[in-house]
């Protein structure tokens, strides 16, 4: 018993020390310089908001950017952690009225960039960072277009630097959901900046997620129908992004979508909860609407 407790203590001490060293490393100048090695280029591909609609829930009521306190938006220290995360992931950009002033949107983004030039454990978490990059690029009409060269350079540098960090850290994430979201962010950045390194890394990561998450019959190892729907949504999203940007679609992606699509076609017709781990009765109306939006009609869905 004494030996077991001693080993447990040593293990805990080792892991704590390792984590502390890791935190110091991420905040070091050495690491900052490492992720700052970037070849600056401009956005050449802008993903359609309709393709990303399965990823983001839009507020029906549009926000006018002029109504926000652009000068003090990053100085509010009274926000709860949840609201702070929502503010820093920039998903609220999807609810901004497109008639709003791009210059105000860009001034808010540039203030964030200046405040978060280096790694910050609160604002550079995998899920928050991934959502921020997706939102910045997807909303380029407000966040990027009609800006001067100086702004574009800072924006491009920040996006690429954050993606470099994401690539370094994503394998350490314990959440498959966060890994998949990060994978989407890396792929979108690779497509938008015509960066083959990012695109190839993102697609290779996607392949690893598929290998580790599915059994030989292409069903989630969790046996969860909800998880099946989650994966299918993201895989269809990646395929549509590749298709829209005129890039080749990997065979493994078409294959997993085909088999998940067949399962989805069966389970989506069942209204009652199924007796699998962690399953609940699902409302599939929104995803079906999305499939129709990207022209995958019901009769062809078994063949996807």
PLM region spans:
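Carbohydrate-active enzyme catalytic cores, enriched for enzymes
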Residues: 222-297, 301
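Extreme N-terminal leader/anchor segments
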Residues: 1-69
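Polar helix-capping/helix-linker motif
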Residues: 28, 44-47, 114, 125, ...
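Aromatic-lined, polymer-binding surfaces characteristic
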Residues: 80-257
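Intrinsic-disorder-associated interaction segments
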Residues: 3, 10, 14, 44-45, ...
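Long, low-complexity, highly charged intrinsically disordered regions
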Residues: 64-81
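Generic structural signal of hydrophobic/aromatic residues within well-ordered alpha-helices
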Residues: 6, 10-13, 17, 21, ...
């Amino acid at each position: 018993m004494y030996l077991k407790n001693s080993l447990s203590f040593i293990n805990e001490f080792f892991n704590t020390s390792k984590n502390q060293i890791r935190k110091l490393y991420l905040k070091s100048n050495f690491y900052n310089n490492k992720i700052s090695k970037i070849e600056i280029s401009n956005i050449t591909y802008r993903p359609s908001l309709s393709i990303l609609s399965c990823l983001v829930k839009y507020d029906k009521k549009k926000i006018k950017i002029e109504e926000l306190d652009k000068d003090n938006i990053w100085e509010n220290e009274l926000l709860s952690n949840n609201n702070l995360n929502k503010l820093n992931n920039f998903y609220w950009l999807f609810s901004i009225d497109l008639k709003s002033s791009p210059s105000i949107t860009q001034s808010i983004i540039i203030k964030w960039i200046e405040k978060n030039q280096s790694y910050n454990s609160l604002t550079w978490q995998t899920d928050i960072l991934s959502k921020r990059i997706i939102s910045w690029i997807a909303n380029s009409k407000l966040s990027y277009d009609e800006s001067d060269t100086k702004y574009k350079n800072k924006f491009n540098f920040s996006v690429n630097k954050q993606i470099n960090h994401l690539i370094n850290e994503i394998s350490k994430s314990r959440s498959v959901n966060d890994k998949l979201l990060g994978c989407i962010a890396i792929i979108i950045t690779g497509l938008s900046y015509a960066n083959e390194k990012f695109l190839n890394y993102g697609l290779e990561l996607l392949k690893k997620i598929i290998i580790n998450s599915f059994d030989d019959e292409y069903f989630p190892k969790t046996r969860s129908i909800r998880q099946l729907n989650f994966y299918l949504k993201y895989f269809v999203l990646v395929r549509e992004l590749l298709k829209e940007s005129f890039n080749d679609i990997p065979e493994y992606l078409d294959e997993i979508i085909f088999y998940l699509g067949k399962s989805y076609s069966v389970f989506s017709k069942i209204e009652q909860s199924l007796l699998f781990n962690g399953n609940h009765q699902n409302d599939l109306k929104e995803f079906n609407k999305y499939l129709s939006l990207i022209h995958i009609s019901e009769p062809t869905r078994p063949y996807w």
